[in-house]
Amino acid sequence: MVLLSKFDFSGKESGKFELPDAFFTEGKEQSVKDYLVAIQANKRQWSACTRGRSEVSHSTKKPFRQKGTGNARQGCLAAPQFRGGGIVFGPKPKFDQHIRINKKERRAAIRLLLAQKIQTGKLIVAENSVFVSSLDAPKTKEALRFLKECNVECRGVLFVDGLAHVGSNENLRLSVRNLSAVRGFTYGENISGYDIAAARNIVVSEKALELLVESLVSTTKD
């Protein structure tokens, strides 16, 4: 069992969060790399498509007579040297190049990325009240104070809350979005491995971490 410090909005330690040892089972670094590559590759549309000389709309009329003009002979306006002509060796969507990652691989990669953040001290746990009722109105100054009191490096911070449709975290979300140190605000049910890998520091609510542990640890039982 691993114990993580839990902080309130004043930046003081208010308790401990228990993580099962199964959360830190060894994983393959290659699986993390494959997962991150798949996320980035699947953001592409793979829809670039150009028309060759046989596909463009054009007249079959010869541009000018074969001899006597002094110009090089031409037989078709669809040739690539003409404006509106076909493209030579242009891109074509040859096949579906999306990379598929199954659920087990995805969850294993996310679990390993979170474990690395915890082991390097880049993840802190905040009380649920920090995300729900800590602010009566959006206050960027108070959000920045919270990060400093918790000794969070103000750089590339990702806030992770529980479920998107539960609780009222709008004030905190509006407070942190104006900070250059904050990378983003997301929810445990929507988080991706790329969000975790790209963030330098993570502030996660109790509820979000409970949901992540519940969904990720079960995959280690084969």
Swiss-Prot record:
Please give the subunit comment from the record. Part of the 50S ribosomal subunit.
A molecular-function term among this protein's GO annotations: rRNA binding
Please provide the record's keywords in A-Z order: Ribonucleoprotein, Ribosomal protein, RNA-binding, rRNA-binding
Q: Which InterPro entries match?
A: Ribosomal_uL4, Ribosomal_uL4-like, Ribosomal_uL4_dom_sf
The UniProt similarity line reads: Belongs to the universal ribosomal protein uL4 family.
Which Gene3D superfamilies does the record associate with it?
3.40.1370.10
State the function annotated in the UniProt record.
One of the primary rRNA binding proteins, this protein initially binds near the 5'-end of the 23S rRNA. It is important during the early stages of 50S assembly. It makes multiple contacts with different domains of the 23S rRNA in the assembled 50S subunit and ribosome. Forms part of the polypeptide exit tunnel.
Q: Which domain of life is it from?
A: Bacteria
Q: What is this protein called?
A: Large ribosomal subunit protein uL4
Does the UniProt entry include the keyword Ribosomal protein?
A: yes
Gene Ontology CC: one annotated term: ribonucleoprotein complex
Pfam families listed in its UniProt record: Ribosomal_L4
Transmembrane domains' residue ranges: none
SUPFAM superfamilies in the record = Ribosomal protein L4 (SSF52166)
Among its keywords, does the record have Ribonucleoprotein? yes
Q: Which GO terms describe its biological process?
A: translation
For region Disordered, the annotated ranges are: 50-72
